[in-house]
């Protein structure tokens, strides 16, 4: 005949509490181990996006003004003479440089979709050719053009715009100025048409 455990743990065994505690510890161990082995990207190299920046327009007044510094890959938002926001950006990559100069916001479109840059996709939604220029790249048979999404677009010169997009730590766009999500919203909401935009090298 087997002996029962000592009195100090007998209540746990009798009431099943020991099993419940062991089960909870095992579940916590399994759940916490999921983060130790993240799923790898399927293909390619994706550099980490840069930090978004900051925004504080409390007690700020005056007209909006945006300054983009290509060398720093930074954008600055002013109200009057007060700097109220700063963010990392990604400007035009080599061959697609963002033109320096003095401009103004001429139009805004929160849900803009490019008619020039995007992908050729088949009827099932599979991307056949990515990152294409529809003016130059021939469309493969059986595909259609799917324009790149450019949320919170503010156009300042022809097809050049500031908009939400992927912001790696280098110039990577087709000439537009990409901003991180929340900062694109802040700039869009606070820059009316006519806002001066200065792009410097």
What are these regions (language model features)?
Residues 4-22:
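Bacterial N-terminal signal peptides that target proteins for export
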Residues 71-73, 80-83, 92-94, 108-111, ...:
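Solvent-exposed coil/turn segments that connect beta secondary-structure elements
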Residues 31-53:
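Bacterial Sec signal peptide processing site at the extreme N-terminus
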Residues 49-65, 70-71, 85-103, 135-143, ...:
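N-terminal post-signal-peptidase region of extra-cytosolic proteins
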Residues 65-69, 74-76, 88, 104-106, ...:
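Soluble periplasmic/extracytoplasmic beta-strand elements of cell-envelope proteins
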């Amino acid at each position: 005949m087997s002996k029962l455990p000592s009195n100090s743990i007998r209540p746990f065994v009798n009431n099943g509490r020991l099993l419940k505690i062991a089960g909870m510890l095992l579940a916590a161990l399994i759940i916490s181990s999921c983060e130790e082995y993240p799923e790898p990207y399927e293909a390619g190299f994706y550099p980490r996006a840069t930090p978004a920046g900051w925004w504080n327009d409390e007690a700020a007044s005056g007209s909006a003004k945006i300054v983009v510094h290509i060398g720093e890959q930074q954008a600055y938002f002013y109200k009057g003479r007060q700097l109220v926001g700063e963010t990392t950006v990604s400007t035009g990559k080599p061959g697609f440089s963002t033109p320096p100069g003095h401009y103004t916001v001429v139009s805004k479109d929160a849900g803009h979709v490019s008619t020039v840059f995007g992908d050729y996709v088949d009827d099932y939604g599979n991307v056949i050719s990515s990152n294409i220029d529809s003016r130059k790249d021939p469309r493969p048979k059986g595909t259609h053009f799917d324009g790149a999404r450019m949320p919170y677009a503010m156009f300042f010169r022809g097809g050049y715009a500031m908009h939400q997009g992927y912001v790696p730590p280098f110039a990577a766009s087709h000439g537009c100025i990409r901003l991180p999500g929340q900062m694109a919203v802040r700039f869009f909401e606070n820059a009316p048409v006519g806002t001066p935009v200065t792009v410097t090298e």
